[in-house]
């Protein structure tokens, strides 16, 4: 995993979650911290983020609004929502809008670890699929470039298969 965005308005809680993330054993190249949803959205607009852990209740822009805004972006991170409110309606609304995990406060280190491991597995699967698609596209391109007797119909069929 390259980047994780941690969005939590309470500094002590944010620091505690960061320590749990760092000690999880899951390799993360960069952890970025924000204290509100608006700052997080600005970061998400400027660079790809693999995973985001976000609080629900925050100033300026809460986690629910942040998750809604993320749906408009091209690159969407895997999202875990963290909340002190154990309300079913919150969880359902967030899950419908792209949140994969809902973590209740107080945050448990094992839940953080399992969530990171799950997200890391999803990221590895995505990267493997992208690599496979690139390899197939490269092979198809080689075929089209090196065979002089290839027909227009064959080229169109190859292009249709790669979509």
Predicted features and spans:
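Active-site residues of response regulator receiver
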Residues: 8, 55
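Two-component/phosphorelay signaling modules centered on CheY-like receiver
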Residues: 11-32
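Interdomain helical linkers/hinges and coiled-coil/dimerization scaffolds
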Residues: 107-163
